[in-house]
Amino acid sequence: MPVGVVLAFLAYASFSVADALIKTTGPALSVFEIAFFTTTFSIIPAMLTKRGERWRDMYKLEHPWLVHLRCLTAISGTACVMYAFTHIQFAEVYAIGFTTPLFVTLLSVLLLREHVALHRWVLLFISFLGVVLVIRPGMRALETGHFVMMAGAVLGAITTTILRHVAPKERRVSLVGLQVLYSAIVNAVLMLPDFVVPTPAQLGVLLGIGLLGGMGGLLLIQASRQTPANLIAPVQYSQLIWAILFGALFFNEYPDWIAIVGMLVVVGAGLLNVLTERPRIRWKPRIFFFRIGQ
């Protein structure tokens, strides 16, 4: 197995553990407080590594309006995803999150004028049907978390589409640094009305979430440098396995057979979509891409 694929598995496992910790923290702290601390802590691993760019160049932008808009959509997406993790089943969050490629494709056609082959549209539609099997609207009462997560998927698609447009022209330090700065300021303000001083144990969990997210991002970057993206991208679907496992072990969540079939449909269509895509160089963030804009 290529080293990059192993690193990708470790990266997505780190993300999944961090997501499980978010779910445990949610009932006690607001999503904005969780986002503030975890995003702040997530930059620690990056600060300990060698940087190729200077932080003082962070504000030198070629597309300032788009970069700032991306920061706002990423922050909004973060709040949606964290809310969903604390209100609906673990695996359902990931299943809905995997609809993001569908929205990215739609936006790429509408805004970036990209051509999308017919077979990719078919696979994306099949993937969406898989999500319908998971959440089954009309057959059961959907919770607010389902709608919020769908909004998060749309916001994630907007964030990713903007990133695909500006990434070749902007500094990485600008894209990452401004995202962290925006997140710190906006979440610091929004968390004030419901702010709760974290206990030492909660602070330790928040630190763990941030470090795991930051380390996962670095592992994914290293994986992309060593192995082609078309081999790394399918690994993201391992998160559904972690979600089912963690949901059963720690949250007493057991998807029924229809939901499991839906997840298999999502994974199968997603893998075929990735494997039939023409290789190209681009930023490929994780499924939880929009939380800290990695």
Predicted regions and their residues:
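Juxtamembrane helix-entry segments on the extracytoplasmic side of multipass membrane proteins
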Residues: M1-G4, F36, Y59-H63, R136-L155, ...
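Membrane-interface interhelical linkers
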Residues: M1-L10, I43-L69, E170, L181, ...
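C-terminal transmembrane-helix exit sites in multi-pass transporters
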Residues: V81-Y83, T100-V122, D194, I241-I260
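Helix-helix packing/entry segments at the starts of transmembrane helices
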Residues: Y94-T99, V166, E170-L181, G217-A248
